[in-house]
């Protein structure tokens, strides 16, 4: 993937850039793997906003991605197309399996149209192949990793994400996560070899607010710019600093939010580095 920069023909174009999509081989998705997707605008079934800054944007269709792949062990597949997916930062690859079934997977870096992909313990260690962590050599870079065996990929699914397999001891495997956190997972959990493609996506300059609105991202308004009825930092005569320590719109103190009593904390060897207060 490359990035194409625009000339400053308008204020919105000045400094903005866009992906060149050279790796994409088809513009329309596989019809059998597409489902309708209704925009929720960040609201729950009661109509209340539960996730701020969401709404609007272009209508999308959901592409069904195979995050498990365990039921295709020993069945080879051919990469038919690399496609754009509006629902994620990564590209997706359409696989044609030898038994006639078609499925989407996340497209790893350097995976190309026509490549052969395999699943299961006998698969080679090459990008796109999916197998259990206990069958992958220590030091290998992987992505789309399960948290629990058979639960489907949960870690390292966005563009450019990768996890390094640091060690394997008994029934557990030690991983270095994209955040820098080092944690252990069950060695039976599956992962896909390689890193997620489209790594340059993070370098795109959106140029104007309107391009983010096309993606369904609404403005982020500061609490001190609101009225007291809308935020604890709101109100005051003239511009004020908020008058208290930073809090959320619901009065929750700013800082770390992970519970120290969370059961899975025992599997975290080293926490990620963060600037947030404890």
Curated annotation (Swiss-Prot):
GO terms for molecular function: rRNA binding; structural constituent of ribosome; transferase activity. It comes from Streptomyces avermitilis (strain ATCC 31267 / DSM 46492 / JCM 5070 / NBRC 14893 / NCIMB 12804 / NRRL 8165 / MA-4680). Residues 27-57, 224-278 are annotated as: Disordered. It comes from the Bacteria. One of the primary rRNA binding proteins. Required for association of the 30S and 50S subunits to form the 70S ribosome, for tRNA binding and peptide bond formation. It has been suggested to have peptidyltransferase activity; this is somewhat controversial. Makes several contacts with the 16S rRNA in the 70S ribosome. Keywords: Ribonucleoprotein, Ribosomal protein, RNA-binding, rRNA-binding. InterPro entries: NA-bd_OB-fold (IPR012340), Rib_uL2_dom2 (IPR014722), Ribosomal_uL2 (IPR002171), Ribosomal_uL2_bac/org-type (IPR005880), Ribosomal_uL2_C (IPR022669), Ribosomal_uL2_CS (IPR022671), Ribosomal_uL2_dom3 (IPR014726), Ribosomal_uL2_RNA-bd_dom (IPR022666). This is Large ribosomal subunit protein uL2. Signal peptide: none annotated. The keyword rRNA-binding applies. Pfam families: Ribosomal_L2, Ribosomal_L2_C. Gene3D superfamilies: 2.30.30.30, Nucleic acid-binding proteins (2.40.50.140), Ribosomal protein L2, domain 3 (4.10.950.10).
């Amino acid at each position: 993937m490359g990035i194409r920069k625009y000339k400053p023909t308008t204020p919105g174009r000045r400094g903005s850039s866009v992906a060149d999509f050279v790796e994409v081989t088809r513009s329309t998705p596989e019809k059998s793997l597409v489902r309708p997707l209704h925009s929720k605008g960040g609201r729950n079934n009661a109509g209340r906003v539960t996730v701020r800054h969401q709404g609007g944007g272009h209508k999308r269709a959901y592409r069904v991605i195979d995050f498990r792949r365990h039921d295709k062990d020993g069945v080879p597949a051919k990469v038919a197309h690399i496609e754009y997916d509006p629902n994620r930062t990564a590209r997706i690859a359409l696989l044609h399996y030898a038994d006639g079934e078609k499925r989407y997977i996340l497209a790893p870096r350097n995976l190309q149209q026509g490549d052969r992909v395999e699943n299961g313990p006998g698969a080679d260690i090459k990008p796109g192949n999916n197998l259990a962590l206990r069958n992958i050599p220590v030091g290998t870079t992987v992505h789309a990793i399960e948290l629990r065996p058979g639960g489907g990929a949960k870690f390292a699914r966005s563009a450019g994400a990768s996890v390094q397999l640091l060690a394997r001891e008994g029934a557990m495997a030690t991983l270095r996560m994209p955040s820098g956190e080092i944690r252990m997972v069950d060695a039976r959990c599956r992962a896909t070899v390689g890193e997620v493609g489209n790594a340059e996506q993070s370098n795109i300059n959106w140029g104007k607010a309107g391009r983010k609105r096309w993606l369904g991202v609404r403005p982020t308004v500061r609490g001190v710019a609101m009225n007291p009825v809308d935020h604890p930092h709101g109100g005051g005569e003239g511009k004020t600093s908020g008058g208290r320590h930073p809090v959320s719109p619901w009065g929750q103190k700013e800082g770390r939010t992970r519970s120290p009593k969370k059961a899975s904390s025992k599997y975290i060897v080293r926490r990620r580095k963060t600037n947030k207060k404890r």
